[in-house]
């Protein structure tokens, strides 16, 4: 089976572009592909608890809703460790959002 790693690089600075990787991950998963969502650069901010609640792209579903769907589908979300540390998040991990299974977004 084909696998995809879908990369997000934009955060709250560009809500529309920040939302698109989550839409792509959801659609790819629904079409039967194995998917990983990779957050790097400014997108690592989106892994922080509560941040997605305030991100709404132009004419798009709110990121909060998409994040809930992505998590419910079990799509892994990887967060760039170096990017998170540079933005002073994720060390220790309590400020990263949790998946429904109780695992924080994985760093690779």
Regions found by a protein language model. Give the residues of each.
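A glycine-rich helix N-cap at a beta->alpha junction
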Residues: 54-81, 86
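Histidine-anchored nucleotide/phosphate-binding helix
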Residues: 18-31
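Short, flexible loop segments at the rims of nucleotide/cofactor-binding pockets, characterized by
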Residues: 53-58, 94-98
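C-terminal structural segments of small proteins and small subunits
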Residues: 87-108
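Short internal beta-strands
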Residues: 35-40, 77-81
